[in-house]
Amino acid sequence: MRARELRAQTLDQMKDELAKLKKEQFNLRFQKATGQLEKAARVRQVRRDIARVKTFLRQKIKESKV
């Protein structure tokens, strides 16, 4: 997910994206625990995407309060 794409999204879209990423992260952790994980790098990528979405979400909330 690119920063440019996140800036263009609304708060609701970001919240939906965050929920989707958290669900994917849960599934990846489950796959890792059961030994079925094929792409280990995806865990890191999803974790960073979650951080990125949270950062932009926080910025949007802060901007709307000002």
UniProtKB/Swiss-Prot annotation:
This is Large ribosomal subunit protein uL29. The lineage of its organism: Bacteria, Pseudomonadati, Pseudomonadota, Alphaproteobacteria, Hyphomicrobiales. The keyword Ribonucleoprotein applies. One of its GO terms (biological process) is translation. GO terms for cellular component: cytosolic large ribosomal subunit. It comes from Bartonella quintana (strain Toulouse) (Rochalimaea quintana). InterPro entries: Ribosomal_protein_uL29, Ribosomal_uL29, Ribosomal_uL29_sf. Gene3D superfamilies: 6.10.140.1970. It holds the Pfam family Ribosomal_L29. Keywords: Ribonucleoprotein, Ribosomal protein. One of its GO terms (molecular function) is structural constituent of ribosome. Belongs to the universal ribosomal protein uL29 family. The keyword Lyase does not apply.
